[in-house]
Amino acid sequence: MRRITLLMALCLPLLCFAQKERVATDKANYDPKLWTKRLYNLQWIPGTETYMYYKDGNIAIFDPKGEEVGGINIAKLSQTYELKSYPDIVYVDGSQVVVETPDHFYIYDYLIERPMFEIALPEKAENRAYNHAQRAVAYTMDNNLFLATEAEPRFPIAVSKNENIISGQAIHRNEFGIQEGIFWSPKGNYIAFYEKDVTHVGDYPLVDINTTPATLKNIKYPMAGTHNEIARVGVFDLKERKTSYLRIDNRDAHYLTNLAWSPDENQLLLAEVKRSQDHYDLNSYDRASGQKIQTLWQESNPKWVEPENAAIFLPNKPQEFIWMSEKDGFMNLYLCDASSAKSRQLTSFKWVVQEVLGFDAKGENVFIGGTGEDPRERHIYSVNIRKGTVKKLTTKEGAHDAYLSDNGRYFLDVHSALNTPYNVSLFDIQANTSKTLYEAENPLANYQLGKVELLTLKADDGTPLYAKMVKPSDFDPEKKYPVLVYVYGGPHDQLVINQWNGATYPWMLALAENEQYLVFTLDNRGSENRGFAFESVIHRNLATYAMKDQMTGVEYLKSLPYVDSNRLAIYGWSFGGFLTSSLMYRHPGTFTTAIAGGAVIDWKYYEAMYGERYMDTPEENPEGYQDNLVTRYIKNLQGNILYIHGYIDPIVLPQHMLAISQAAIDEGKVIHSFLYPNQEHNVRGAESIHLTKIIVDFLLKNNKAATND
């Protein structure tokens, strides 16, 4: 009996390992078993020191000690409004919450468990913005802007019969941090809104194949160097029920960005960026007259300027505000005065401030999120506004996101790191203590998946380059492994992050395990969160430094004894598709296989706002556009390349894929392509599983010994 027990003990680890499940590579991204369990609808209750989240199907409310002090009966709420799924709950006032459905805003008092009032909306209402002080919703429909109240669901704020006049929507194709087009004033007495005239913007035809015959849908698309939209800012007075406009001369079609209200509702601040994007002015305007008051801040840079964050006013000094700028090379904070137009630098970090979270009750300290010394991480800091002293509040390595309480006493710290799943702590800023509220279990513990490692390489000038590699769980350094290099490499993205699994797609973890692959990713110069000098090397020539750094990564791979240098493949999407194509053609023979999704092929076909920032116009920079023209290099193709594109992509237009196809014909080269007829720039829904299958199948079929076809 003892011998049997001993034998079982010896075999137990093997049995446990054998019990681990494999995950289908193409389904890994969408397998809920692999998702980390989170605290859903986590938020502070305004004006209190209590917070809430979904627990056991209901909303639970907690005090700072972590004790449950109340909640919302979701079954009762759902019954009241005939809800078919868990609603997103937003607290607005005391015990009142807002429940949003496709055609209503409901205000519900959870203490007495009954509805207070409701606002009906048309089915086509979009861009909806609720204001509790006015018990009203501003929304857009058919390019026009309306106001809905209990009594009146469709009061016109800005309505035009001209379909080229669009009100209440984000402008400038969501560049400059613009995510919305409706801005309630602090007390709810006014609504500011963006309006754009796209009359002179070129039409681009997209085809809907779901009709018989197929029908044409034109979109407005301002290609680099062509006519741009003309924007302006409107102001609606709720009491007078009248709309007026700021007096901005915008005949030069410059960009209107980062709109903000002053606390007294008398001024609006607006960052106005030249079309050339090498200069901007932060101007204040009088709300009543629409006249410009003064310029509060100016910034110029021969490469580009890119304001992305609106002014944030101090709670105790309504004339002062925080402005974020990278004029010194890194995104830092500046304290500005809206009356005197004076400013001073508040922080001088040699790292990137990513977000202003809020202030303490006295307005003496501002809380921020930023990379800190390691750009792969994100930490929370407090900055004393008068003294400039800085205190780092989070200490665990990894990525921290914070939800600050209204009084600035506490924040909910949402954290993960490479080997640490999602967890939430309550941080008491005053006491400098942290209490763990929730730790998610490792959702991958029972599955056979690859493991992620973080790496540091050096560019040709000594600049650190951060990378990551996924290896099979049974990695054997004596074996030879094929490699998939996954790239993005462009502005406003970072792929190598010290958060759970290195922010790696689950299908790549499954690929490493199931197919005995290595998956390698490197953030080259040009990617974000490293400061302006690191990012701006791409100016006027997007591919040069990106390719240099990616080839540094390739040389590193080739130096590893366990890498099969004859079986390197590369994959990227959007800018990553451009970089994938550039590397495949301009470094022929390096990769046997390439997969380029939603790829930019010719930058003169790309949108003006983004393209002109980094490349100037085709007229100003003909050499740069020619050097970065992917079709120019297709004659060098060795191996196999697959292009994937959404047929109704409104961002990287289908014209790019057609251009590379024609170039292949002209050069007598064979490329592979796949269109998703009903998808836009990113393939979504059930078809994304098909996308992963397409990628993996092409990779496995073609990433063999290099050929010279």
Can you describe what each PLM-predicted range is?
Residues 3, 136, 179-182, 224, ...:
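Residue-level detector of secondary-structure boundary/capping sites
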Residues 3-4, 52, 682:
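Hydrophobic alpha-helical segments, especially transmembrane helices
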Residues 203, 265, 401-709:
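Serine-hydrolase catalytic core recognition
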Residues 16-392, 397-401, 409-410, 420, ...:
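Beta-propeller folds
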Residues 1-3, 60, 489:
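Disordered, low-complexity tails and leader-like regions
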Residues 1-23, 708-709:
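Bacterial Sec-dependent N-terminal signal peptides
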